[in-house]
Amino acid sequence: MLHEFTLSRGRAMINFTLKYCDTKQKLLSSYGFKRAVEAFVKSLKRDEVIIYDHYVKAFKTEEDFIESIIESFKLLTVFNVEEVIAVDNKYSVFFEDKDLFIELIDLMGLFWKKLERYTIVRNSRLGQGLQNVRFIQANDMFNELVLSTWRRIQDTVNGYEQRVYRQMTAGANASLTLNDVSWNCPIEYKGLAEIPFISTVVIQPPFISYTKKNTRDGIFREHQQNPLENIVLNEDDWFVFPAKVGSMLTFVYFHKDFMVHGVGLANLFELAKESEYIGKKPDIIYVFGYPDGAEEKRTFYYKDKKNDILIGYANYCDDIDYFGYMKKMLLTLHNVKQIEHRNLPIHGAMVNIVLKNGKESNIVIMGDSGAGKSESLEAFRSLNASYIRHMRVIFDDMGFLKKEEDGSITGYGTEIGAFVRIDDLDPAYAYEQLDRGIYTNPDRINARVTIPISTYEVIMKGYKVDLMLYANNYTESDKKIVFYDDLDEAINIFEDGARKAKGTTTEKGLVKSYFANPFGPVQEQAETEVLVREFFSDMKKDGVKIGEIHTSLAIEGKAKDGPHEAAVELFSLINE
């Protein structure tokens, strides 16, 4: 990142490497503050015409109005109102209607708070710069500087100090340290080599963001040409998040205009250590937000067999401005790779439960979006006090099954976090996540929160499967748990992948997708069919119970009670 400050698409980025403001005068004299005032005045012209017209008429031009805001703010941090007017009488315009000026100051503060704000430090080599000792401290000091400057201006104009203070996040919502590192870059991807890697992420929750889209549409198809060959990314516009998606080392390149999705990865996937990617070749590369000139959405993957790298691609357009396009492409890439490795991807949830009587069980609940897998976990959590001594979430959307050397089938996760609908969480639990969640479009349908729920060590430990259940969200049933002795019947239910859509995508009504997993198995169906029969046969031989759990999630009036009732019945079965 070469500029000290950029502002676009409601996102402000402040480069601490080039400019770090530690006094009020430095802050108010900075290029970044001027850009913020310019953007604020443009928003006034659009949304607060009366206020805009009043001041532009008084100062003759918009440029003079902007300069007068900046200069008067500088003076107000040092002098009282009378002294400011004495410096230059033109500033008296602001104090002729003091209430209007206070409203202007408040509106500017609100405008700044509504922006997504990021601070960045870039180091030319590891161990340099602010990040090792002072990065978090520098962000805390910057937050306090912005807050104290704003309050000083308010107090000076009012003529008295405030008596109630609210310690809000006035600096950055999130902060990144970047390192320039070398990785084993094939010649085809030399245009990616200069992009800095994210080494540290600091999030100031609650982080609330608004995106252009609120649902995801379609599936990702294989492409026959490499979309990354010969492209060159501008190091001023791009970042790399080195993620561990399950067992796959993944380099996620994202454009700065989709910053919230890149930062959201920190709550969802393990951030790799430098030793895990310096000089290494990744399993997966995903480029998110490349401006290729196409107006329509282009999202696909390509198998680079020569370099043994799976490539994901999403072009720059408003349609991809939803975290689902970041998360689900990465999971698709992961699953395609796991199928190549003869492992079976599972779209669902897995939990390790230890009951109060000491009995332990590892449960896999499989189902596509809206089937009730996450809601079942919430129901388990709500029953914690009555039944459970301990509960570990192995995965809460995507995982994979692996055949171990002793022949047992074990489950592994892909994510350390979850991207879940706020409406489907218990309200108390949803509010408990305020101190660590990234909230997206919280006032809209399909509002989401990305929260950490596990550790990488837990999801990659490997847990032997005891129960394998398909989440049926659309059939009424008095018996919530049904097991099948006929393996072919069970496989048909799992492969049919039926569920009633709940609005998490653009689908409606009763829909089906092969193996309830449009993120890999649908694209690689022939290979997956072989694996399904192998794994289900091995599980049956190993005594794993295979069946359905009726969540009733899509049945009118059952969205809350259905998963709860199913969880109670499941615990009774485990307890037998």
Which positions does each model-derived feature cover?
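Conserved NTP phosphate-binding and transfer environment spanning the P-loop NTPase/kinase superfamily
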Residues: 2-172, 176, 444-576
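Short, glycine-/Ser/Thr-/acidic-enriched flexible segments
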Residues: 257-258, 317, 356-358, 370-371, ...
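Phosphate/oxyanion-binding active-site loops and adjacent basic polyanion-contact surfaces
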Residues: 100-104, 322-330, 372-373, 527-528
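Charged, amphipathic alpha-helical linker segments immediately N-terminal to NTP-binding catalytic cores
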Residues: 110, 288-345, 542-554
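Glycine-rich phosphate-binding P-loop
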Residues: 355-386
